[in-house]
Amino acid sequence: MDAVNLDVVHGERRAILGPNGAGKTTLFNVICGDVTASSGSVELFGEDVTRRPARYRAKLGLARTYQQSRLFNGLTVEDSIYLSIVGVEGGRLRPVLLPGRDRAARERAREAARTVAISHKLGALVGSLSHGEHRQVAIAMALAAEPKALMLDEPASGLSRGERQLLTDLLVGLDRAITLILIEHDMDIALRVAERVTMMHDGRVIVEGTPAEIRANETVHDLYLGRGYRNE
């Protein structure tokens, strides 16, 4: 990345678009603390976290999903979300919860499942789910952390048309108290969900604006749409 500046305000819906290799995921990883930038700074919720690890940023209220599934096929949907709340350490549950706290964590897990419309699968094993349902569970796990900001890395990748519509409805309906930032190749979803769009190319931000401005921008057409991009 080169001279990238991303300023997102509380409650905003922001999409980051660009072809493969544009630097989108690298930018995500720097923000989340999974990668340390060679220069520059990262500020979250008014605090400089440039040298802080990912777990510290998560405690501040940052949650994310990944392009590749990180779910365990042998767990149920409910247990997957539940464990994302109580945490694990050394392969075991981190300290045993008191009954009241355990019930509260279970209810948070179920509420997160309801939010992403996967509650009918709470007892199903993750290994039995479709690709789209995997995405729903991953988002539920992130939401169960009750984040201030949610970052989604290509959530529509590999989804069917119907699953993309379900995802779009889910993201549009998210609590406005949660700041949403998503990387997407699906321009239709990004422009329907986001209020502002950041377009990247070769590690640089080339355009930033509203969905209407992005649709009308000649640079976007020349460097992105004109390079074989096709909405399906």
What are the functions of these language-model segments?
Residues 1-232:
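Glycine-rich phosphate-binding loops of nucleotide-dependent enzymes
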